[in-house]
């Protein structure tokens, strides 16, 4: 049993340290912006409700991609597998040409960019935008779900500033 060492004021650094110890699944979120497709890597995606299907995520308002993304009416949340580490890194790199030759994607009939080979892609309609601090929390209703052909791929997770593959060896029970 770990004995608490005491309470500390919730500084920004201590808060970030706490969440570095908390693993999170990785997603790439894409939308059609006014100047073309936009996208970013996110570790904040979570399910909110199964009926109706709703998810939520947060993005930094300082990001130009996030600014265009949160103004869209619809978007696609791609839940990534470990074999898509390169895509996660590409969409996390500021100033990268995310929709150039490195990413295999195509526009859906509704206009949003869909990344090929994502294990899961959830097309969503934004329901709510909530500004909090330097971030925007988005709640979105899932309109359709596309399951990729590689549904048995290990998920990509982020923990302590590094990407990891979650596999059978990590199963505890």
Describe the function of each predicted region:
Residues 1-173:
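Basic, polyanion-binding surface patches
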